[in-house]
UniProtKB/Swiss-Prot annotation:
Species of origin: Rhizobium etli (strain ATCC 51251 / DSM 11541 / JCM 21823 / NBRC 15573 / CFN 42)
Domain of life, source organism: Bacteria
Entry keywords, A to Z: Acyltransferase, Cytoplasm, Transferase
Listed InterPro entries: Acyl_CoA_acyltransferase, Asp_Glu_LeuTrfase, N-end_Aminoacyl_Trfase, N-end_Aminoacyl_Trfase_C, N-end_Aminoacyl_Trfase_N
Name recorded for this polypeptide: Aspartate/glutamate leucyltransferase
Main localization of the protein described in the UniProt heading: cytoplasm
Gene expressing this chain: bpt
Gene Ontology molecular function: arginyl-tRNA--protein transferase activity; leucyl-tRNA--protein transferase activity
GO cellular component, as recorded: cytoplasm
Amino acid sequence: MNTQTTPSPQFYLTAPAACPYLPHEMERKVFTHLVGPRAAEMNDILTQGGFRRSQNIAYRPACESCRACVSVRILAQEFEPTKSMKRVLAANSDVIATEFAAQPSSEQYSLFRRYLDFRHQQGGMSDMTVLDYAIMVEDTHVNTRIIEYRRREEGSGLEERPKGELLAAALTDTMSDGLSMVYSYFNPALERRSLGTFMILDHVRRTKALGLPHVYLGYWVQGSRKMDYKTRFQPQEHLTPRGWERFDPSSMPESTHD
């Protein structure tokens, strides 16, 4: 009897490089390609195991002397917004969110560039071209969508792409157990709207509506101020050597970063 076996994914290790989050640390990553008919299934398994997706690559930290990067996921069905989060929702009551296929636009790239130039001038993405952005959005073999957030105008919702200024966007994977926020960006001039927080709250709402348990936020690095905001969304679980465990935020200082 002939049996067919599905090839196992091949994993690779990057060379050491300077850590973008913690000074004096070096990072390494283990990665594999997400391609073929099992790409979506593998993305589910690997994300639940602490990997992140970037284009058709799934990766996770494999640093020799540091374990600071911790995978975080919100328990969406138990989540209730805090008073400050309710204020964020109220401040963005004029925003309409629309989901599209993972296709880039010049309008998206213009906003993406404004975000990078303001928030990540020295980061590894700072020199991304319009072609780089298009590849980031389109190069996916899993169930990926892009969600646009626009200021609501008269007639919005009656067309395929609503009218109104594009305020923010999120590249999102739908998985068997929830949503994974691959990358999000927003207009940095609209600080009072806390659009970063608003997009996470919207993903929690969407996950609840789907009847799924988790919103994956990527990595949290204790000691990195730019990551502190992720611990505000409770309850949440962190991936430990013992598996996913509920996180106790009582020891963490409250952050106002959005």
